[in-house]
Amino acid sequence: MSLLCVRVKRAKFQGSPDKFNTYVTLKVQNVKSTTVAVRGDQPSWEQDFMFEISRLDLGLSVEVWNKGLIWDTMVGTVWIALKTIRQSDEEGPGEWSTLEAETLMKNDEICGTKNPTPHKILLGTRFELPFDIPEEEARYWTYKLEQINALADDNEYSSQEESQRKLLPTAAAQCRHWTYLGWGEHQTFEDPDSAVDDRDSDYRSETSNSAPPPYHTTTQPNASAHQFPMPVPLPQQLFLQGSSRDSCNDSMQSYDLDYPERRALSPTSSSRYGSSCNVSRGSSLLSELDQYHEQDDDGRERDSIHSSHSYGSLSRDGQAGLGEQEKALEVACESQKEKTGESKERDDATVCPPSDLMLHKDLTLGPQESFPEEKASSPFTQARAHWFRAVTKVRLQLQEISDDGDPSLPQWLPEGPAGGLYGIDSMPDLRRKKPLPLVSDLAMSLVQSRKAGITSAMATRTSLKDEDLKSHVYKKTLQALIYPISCTTPHNFEVWSATTPTYCYECEGLLWGLARQGMRCSECGVKCHEKCQDLLNADCLQRAAEKSSKHGAEDRTQNIIMAMKDRMKIRERNKPEIFEVIRDVFTVSKVAHVQQMKTVKQSVLDGTSKWSAKITITVVCAQGLQAKDKTGSSDPYVTVQVGKTKKRTKTIFGNLNPVWEEKFHFECHNSSDRIKVRVWDEDDDIKSRVKQRLKRESDDFLGQTIIEVRTLSGEMDVWYNLEKRTDKSAVSGAIRLQINVEIKGEEKVAPYHVQYTCLHENLFHYLTDIQGSGGVWIPDARGDDAWKVYFDETAQEIVDEFAMRYGIESIYQAMTHFACLSSKYMCPGVPAVMSTLLANINAYYAHTTASTNVSASDRFAASNFGKERFVKLLDQLHNSLRIDLSTYRNNFPAGSPERLQDLKSTVDLLTSITFFRMKVQELQSPPRASQVVKDCVKACLNSTYEYIFNNCHDLYSHQYQLQEQPLEEPGPSIRNLDFWPKLITLIVSIIEEDKNSYTPVLNQFPQELNVGKVSAEVMWHLFAQDMKYALEEHEKDRLCKSADYMNLHFKVKWLHNEYVRELPALQGQVPEYPAWFEQFVLQWLDENEDVSLEFLRGGLERDKRDGFQQTSEHALFSCSVVDVFTQLNQSFEIIRKLECPDPSILAHYMRRFAKTIGKVLIQYADILSKNFPAYCTKERLPCILMNNMQQLRVQLEKMFEAMGGKELDSEAADSLKELQVKLNTVLDELSMVFGNSFQVRIDECVRQMADILGQVRGTGNASPNARASVAQDADSVLRPLMDFLDGNLTLFATVCEKTVLKRVLKELWRVVMNTMERVIVLPPLIDQTGTQLILTAAKELSQLSKLKDHMVREETRNLTPKQCAVLDLALDTVKQYFHAGGNGLKKTFLEKSPDLQSLRYALSLYTQTTDTLIKTFVRSQTAQVHDGKGIRFTANEDIRPEKGAGVDDPVGEVSIQVDLFTHPGTGEHKVTVKVVAANDLKWQTAGMFRPFVEVTMVGPHQSDKKRKFTTKSKSNSWTPKYNETFHFLLGNEEGPEAYELQICVKDYCFAREDRVIGLAVMPLRDVAAKGSCACWCPLGRKIHMDETGMTILRILSQRSNDEVAREFVKLKSESRSIEEGS
C-alpha cells in the first residue's frame, strides 16, 4: 500500500469568467473525490486529497466539470500514470497540465487522453513518506527489507517477488505500508491533532475556508454528491473473517487527563486507516520483538521471525520455515504479555497488534491479492495454506483470551458492510431523500463525532482501566472515609501558663508574657498561641495515640485506640452507603471488601507509630515575591523544615523570581508532621544584626506554605501559593516544589493528585454511565459554595473527605470535575454546571487580591492540574461547542425548553472560555465569544439552508400538505416555478423559529448578535444567490408564464420586506431582487399592453353597439372610457404593489407602462377621430365622444399622479405629458371638426345678416335718435344668427362637460367671427375666382387682366359709417351672448380673440384712407421677400459683399446705389436711385431674353408724384449692366420709414405683357441712418405678407375707383412667371 497525496490548486480557462462555475473530480482505484465549486475563469480550490494505492500500474484521472442548473458539462480531463508520481514528504509547487477533451480506453480502463483544449490545471501530486520516522530507524528498516527481499529467491514465488518489487518501489514506502496496515488504529493516540481538532477542521472548512492541517483526513463538505464506497473484494473478506475495525484497541484507546499527548480515535477518520499515523511507535514495538528474538541462539528462528515482518514473503525452507514462523508468533505474543506485566484478568489487548498485523499483511499483499495475473492458478497453494493455518491459530488464541477477559471488549466479528476498505477521502453517496423532521440529519455526522470524541475521553480514560491504580485508590479512599478528618476529635484547648520559654507548635514563635502565655490541649498536650489554635487541624485522638506510643504509656494508648475503634465502627454502621458506593465504584467483591476494611482500620489504628517515609524536597523556584529592599527587590532564600529538621537554600540576590534548584533529603516517622516551607529576605545590615541578637528571625518574612505530610505520596511537582503568617504579613507569589515521598510499603504509587483524579473519574463514571445510564446528576445546591458540590450527598462526602485527607485543593477538584463533565457536556443541565464551574475557576485565578502581585497567568501556570492539560481540554471543548452550536437547531430543538436553556448555558460556557483565555491565559486577542457564536449560527444556517434546498419538496409536503402529492423533481426546474414558493415558505419557518425561539435564548450579546436578524440575513443571502442564478437560467428559455414570474416576484418581495428590509447590515443599500425580475416584469408589461388594446377594442365595439350611452345619469361619457382605464388601473396596481425599491428599475417599469398608456389612449383617440365626422350630423353623440376624450385626459392626469406625479421618472413623465398634449390636440381637432360642421348653417345666417345690414341707410352721427336707431338695426341684423345659436347652445350646455362646452363655444365663436368677416366685412372674397386670383397672385400674366375685369365688374360694396356702427354694436351683443353671464367663454378670451381682433381691425381699416392703409402696410410688412433677409450694404458699388445669409434659392440679385437727401428748410426728401446691374439672373427662355429693371416707390402721398421708373432692356444678358439713375421726390408729411422701394426685374416682351423674373423690396428706413449706400438685393419669386397685409390688400382691392389703390394691389400681387423650359 502507498499513500497518494493530491493537491488541487487552481486552473486557467479560456472564455468569459461568468460562464465558469467549476469543480474537480479525482478518480483512482474505484475511489472518487470531488472539490467544491468555484466561479470564474481562474478558479482556486487549494484542496488536499489522500488515497491508498495498492496498484501502481493504474493512473489518476482528473476531470474538471462546469456546474449547470440541470446537468453539468465537462471542461476537460487529465490522466496521470501513478508510476510517474514522485515520492516526497513535502508539498511541491505543482505542475500545470493541459486539459484534454477525450479519454483513451484499454481493457475497460483509462490509459490516456487526447484532443487538447485551451484550458490548464495546476496539480500537486506525490507519494507520502512515513511520517516523522527517525533517520536511524529508516536505515534500520531499509536494511531489514533488503534482507527480506534477498531471501525471496524461492522458485515458487520468484515471479511474485518480482511483481512485488514493482509495487514496493522503496524501502521507505514499504515501511509506510507497515505503519498503515499494522498499527494504524493505535498510532492515533500520538496523532498531532486530537479528535476534536479533527472535527474542527471540518467545521473550519465549512465556515472559514481554511485548509485542513497536513497529513490529515478531512471530509469535503461539498463532495458528497460524487463520492461512493467500494466494497472489499472476496479474497480480502476471506482473511478479514472474524475481524473487526474496533478490535484489539479498547485498552489502547485510553485518554488520561494527566497525559494529554494521548488522544482518542479521530471521529472523522472513520476509515480503517487513520490519517496522521506515526510510524515510530509501531516500529519501536517491532524493534522490541526483534531484540527478543536476537537473544535466541537459533539463527533460523530469528530469520523466520524477521521473515514474518515482511509482506507475505516466506523463508527458504518452505514448510519448516512456516512452522518456525507460527512458533515465533506465539512466542512474540507471550513475551509481549509478560513485558506488560498484566494478569489474565485484565486482558490487556496489546497481545493483538502482532496478529492484527499478520492479518493485514496477508490481506493487503498476499499473493492472491497483489497480483491479479496469478488468479488463474489454484487459490490455495501449499504455502498459502500454511499462511492461512498460522493466521487462524493466532486468531483462535486471541478469541480464547477475549472470552476469559472483560466481556465488554469487542469480539472478532464476521465481515459485513463495515468491513469494507474505503479511500481516505471517500464518502458514501448521499444523493437520496433525507429523513424528516426538519434538519434532523443535517449534522448527524458531527453528533457522532462528538460522541466518539470528547466522550471517548471518559470511556477510555486510563484511570478506568488501570487496575493497580484503582486498587490503591480504593484503599486510600476507604482509609480517608473510615476515619475522616471532618469527624476527628478536636483539640481541647485551655489557657495555659508556661514556666519555661515555650514555642508555639504552629508558628514556632515564642509564647510571650509572664503568665497565661498561650493555649494547651489537655488531651494531646500541644501548645500554641491563642491566634494559632484554629490553624491546628490534626486529630487530637490520633496525635495522642502517637505521642503515648512513643512515650510508652501503653494503657493510655490502648484507651485511645479503643476510642478510635469505636468511632470507626460507628462510622461504618452509620454510613454503610458510603462504603457500599466505594465498593461498587471500584467493582470489589464483598469478600475482598470486608477483608480490605479490616486492613484499613488497622492502618488507621497503627497511625504513625509504624509509619515512616523518606522525603526528598527540591526547591525549584518562586514567582512574584514581595519587594522588601529599598531597591525595589529582595534577596530571597528558603528554609524547609520537616519535624525538627530544618534546612535552607542559598540566597539569590536582587530577584523577585528566583530559581534555586536545590534538593534536600528528610526522614519522617510521623504522618501528622508538617513540612514548613518559608521564604525569607536576607538582610546583612546593622539593623538586621541587632535583630539577630534579640529575635530568632532577623530576616524579613516573604511567605510560607505548610504541607501536611499525610497529603504526600509518590512524585509530585507542585506549585504552592505563599501565605501569611499573621495579618500584618505582606505576602505574595508562589513557590514550586518537587517532592518525592517513599512511604514504607507504598514506594511505587502515584501522587495523591493523580489518585484523586482516579477516584473522581471512576466515581463520575459509575454514577453517570452505570447507575445513571448516561445521564448526569445535576446538584441542587444553593449558596456561595454551591459550585463545589459535584455529586449527591454520599459521593460528595467521599471526594471531599479524600481531598481533605490528602491535601487536594478545591480548585483542583473543580477542574477535575470540569474535565469529567466535558465528556458529557451535551447532557441536559450539564452546560449550566460547567459554565458555573469555569466561572469560579476563572474567578480563582483571575481575581487577584491586594496581598499578591502574581499575575493570573503565573498563578494558572502554577496549577497542579497542569496548565497544558487544562488549556488543551478547554481548546477541545471550545471546538466541540463550536461544532454543536453550528448545528444548534438539531442539538437544541426549539420545542424543548430544557434544551433551549442548555443552549443558553452553552453560550455562557463559551463566554467563560473566552474570559479564561483573556484574563487567565492573558492571550492578546482571543476569539470573541459573540463572534464565535455568530459564526456558529451562520454555519448552522448555511447547513440548514442547504438541507431545506436539497429536500424542499419533501419537507414542504410533510409540513404543509395533508394530501399526497404526485412526485416532483427534487430541485428547481426551468419548466416551472413550483420549487421557489415552497422554499420561501420553509425559509420563513426557519427565520420565525430563530426569531421566536432562539433569539430570546441567545441574548447574551444584544448589541452584537440577534439570531433572528442573522438568520434572515444569511437565509436571504443564500436564497438570493440561488434565486438570481435560477432566474438567469429561466431568462434564456422563459418556459413559464409571465404571470408565474410576477407571482414569484411578489413572494420574494414579501420575504424581503417582512424579514430583510430592516436588517442593519442592509440599511442604505438598494435591494438586488428587483433586478432579477426586471426582464420578466417587462415581458409581463409587453403582454399586458396587448391585453389592454384588446380591452380597448372590445369596449369600443360594445359602446358603438349600444350607441355610446352614458354610463350613468350624472356621467356625461360612455362605458368605453371606463373599460379602458379599468384595465390600465388594474395593471398599474400590480406594478405599484411590487413596491420596487430600486429607483432605476422602477423608472424602467414606469417608462414601459407609460408607453402602454400612450399606445392605448392614442389608439382610442385615433378610432374616435376617424369615426367622429360621421357622427357630427347627430345632436348629442359628438358631445359624448368629445366628453370621452376629455375624460381620457382627466383619467390620465389621475394616473400621472398615482404613478408619482412630480416624483415620476422624467422620461416617463415627459411621455405622459406629451400624451396629454396629444389628447388635448385631438380634442381641439374634434371641437374644430364639430364647429366646422355648423359652417354651412352659419354661412346662411350671416348672409341673411348681410342682406339686412345692406338695407340700413343713414349717417353715423352721435345723436340719441341715431343711437337708438343703430341699436334697433343691430337687433334686426342679429336675429337670423341668434335664432340658430339659441337652439344649439342650450343643448350643448346640457350634454357637454364644462371643458368640452368651452371648446365648442370657442369653435362656434371662431366660425361666426370668420364668417362675418368673410361675408359681411370682406364680401368680394366670397367669390372664389377673386379669392383665387388674389391669393395665388396671378401666376399667369393673362390672369392679371381677368383680375382687373373682375374688380371692375364687382360692384363697390364699401360699408357706410352707420353700417359699421350697427355691425360693431352687433358684435358686442354676440360677445355678451357667448359670455353667457360667466357660464360661457371668458370676456378676456373674447376680447383678445384673434378672430374678433381681425374683424374689428378690418372694420377699422374700412374707415381709413388709401394713404394711411399703404403707410400701415409699409410699416407692418417687414418680411416680404426672403423674410426680409439677404440685403447687404457696402460703402460703394465697387465693393461686392459676401453672399447674403438666410436666403434660400434666390433667382438673381440687383445692385443699386441709393442716396437719401432731406432738404433742411422744407423737410422734403429726395431719393436718388442708381440701378447699377443685375447679377446671376435665373431664367430659361427659347427666344430673345431682354431683362430690364422696374423701380417703384411705395408709400403715402404719392398720388401727384412720379412713382415708377424703368431702365432700358439688355438683350440676352443674364448679368446686365445698367448704370441708370432715377430721382424720387417725397413730401415732408412722413419720414423715410413710411416708404419702401420695390425693385422688379422683368423680361421685355413685344406685343404682350412683360414677364416677372424676380422681386425685391428695400425699406428706406434701412438707408435713412446711412444717408447713402450701395445695396445688394436678392430677388425673390413673390411678395409675402401677413394677415394685416392681406386685409389691407383686400380693402384696397375694393377701391376700384382709386388709381393709387389699384396700382398698389397690382404691384403687391405680382409674382415670378412660369419659365418656358420648366
From Swiss-Prot:
Interacts with RIMS1. Its cofactor is Ca(2+). Keywords: Calcium, Cell membrane, Coiled coil, Cytoplasm, Exocytosis, Membrane, Metal-binding, Phosphoprotein, Repeat, Synapse, Zinc, Zinc-finger. Residues 206-225, 238-254, 266-280 have a biased composition (Polar residues). Belongs to the unc-13 family. Pfam families: C1_1, C2, MUN. The lineage of its organism: Eukaryota, Metazoa, Chordata, Craniata, Vertebrata. One of its GO terms (cellular component) is synaptic membrane. It is a peripheral membrane protein. The keyword Coiled coil applies. This is Protein unc-13 homolog B. Residues 1210-1231 form a coiled coil.
